[in-house]
Regions:
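Mixed-charge interfacial surface used for oligomerization/domain docking
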Residues: 2-7, 13-27, 31-32, 92, ...
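N-terminal glycine-rich anion-binding loop in soluble enzyme alpha/beta folds
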Residues: 6-66, 71
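Structured helix-beta-strand junction loops
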Residues: 23, 57-58, 79, 86, ...
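Short coil/turn segments at secondary-structure boundaries
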Residues: 59-67, 87-94, 126-127
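Short catalytic-loop micro-motif centered on adjacent basic/acidic residues
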Residues: 63, 85, 122, 239-240
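Well-ordered alpha-helical segments embedded in enzymatic catalytic cores
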Residues: 67-75, 221-225
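Active-site cofactor/cluster-binding pocket
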Residues: 70-83, 87-114
Length: 287
């Protein structure tokens, strides 16, 4: 059988762009979500509206579990010449460690069968959601240039170091339920309509970058923060992921287009893990 060129695996925190769907070259490896006694697999059967309803009605914070090494191994098997894996930040999930273990186990299997090891590389995105998807998009672009496996890895690592992730939460309830925010602070923020602007650190953790009074002002502030770290917008793809708020995503796109001529702006809806973090009305932006 003729070997296939390459495959890109993304854990299900990363939402596939439309052109990546229904193709063997891109694949989501699902995490598992839990709300009280309900277990939800974050795959194509995920129902966002039902999931958000369950979160709203629960007194407890939702939880997630990373894909098992076996789940990754199932998608690594096959006649792929090169496999790239992009995981949720290792500061936020065990997905990276699970994928690394899967890589080692797959190649141990091949060694036992006297076969050559697969070319597999696992990237810690140091991001989440569409940040992972933009990395996949970059890898596909580099593969089309005909670069070597090692050169694709080198350039992708460099791209990850220049990436910036931002997000705004409509509600702080999930943080409150998880014990990361006091009930008093959550109440004050909601009463004053304060929207915190969050972002990723260089290591892939989460930090607060600012805040705005009301969503529109918060979006303006988030765009300004992004422009401060984007000296070459004409060369950058911006990705927006929204949790049940397409009008808000369209508003953000207009604000971006008023600031600069970006290479491309892509909008997607959040899958399960990102819906859990962003919650209803949340919006994520990555450049």
């Amino acid at each position: 059988m003729e070997a296939l060129m390459y495959r890109i695996l993304i854990d299900s925190c990363g939402e596939l762009f439309p052109e990546m769907q229904n193709t063997e070259s891109f694949c989501n490896v699902p995490l598992t979500l839990t709300v009280d006694s309900h277990e939800i697999i974050d795959d194509e059967t995920f129902n966002q509206a039902e999931f958000l309803r369950m979160i709203k009605e629960s007194a407890n914070a939702p939880k997630s579990a990373c894909p098992s090494p076996d789940a990754y191994m199932r998608e690594m098997r096959g006649d792929w010449e090169r496999i790239y894996v992009i995981t949720l930040s290792s500061k936020l999930s065990g997905s990276y460690n699970s994928a690394c273990l899967a890589k080692d186990l797959i190649n141990e299997e091949l060694e036992d069968d006297d076969e050559e090891p697969k070319q597999i590389h696992v990237f810690d995105s140091k991001s989440a959601s569409i940040g992972q998807t933009l990395i996949a998009d970059k890898i596909a672009e580099l593969e089309k240039e005909g670069l070597s496996f090692d050169e694709v890895i080198r350039r992708t690592d460099a791209y990850i170091e220049t990436q910036h992730t931002f997000f705004i939460l409509e509600t702080l309830e999930t943080l409150r339920k998880a014990g990361r925010l006091s009930a008093l602070k959550a109440m004050i923020a909601n009463t004053l309509n304060i929207k915190p602007i969050m972002g990723s650190t260089e290591e892939g953790s989460i930090q607060q970058l600012g805040q705005g009074r009301g969503m529109s002002k918060a979006l303006d502030k988030m765009v300004d923060l992004m422009m401060e770290v984007t000296p070459d917008p004409e060369n950058r793809v911006v990705a927006i992921s929204h949790c049940n708020c397409p009008e808000r995503a369209a508003m953000l796109q207009k604000k971006l287009e008023a600031k600069a001529n970006f290479k491309r702006i892509v909008i997607v809806d959040t899958r399960g893990v990102s819906s859990m973090y962003a919650n209803d009305g949340g919006i994520i932006m990555v450049v």
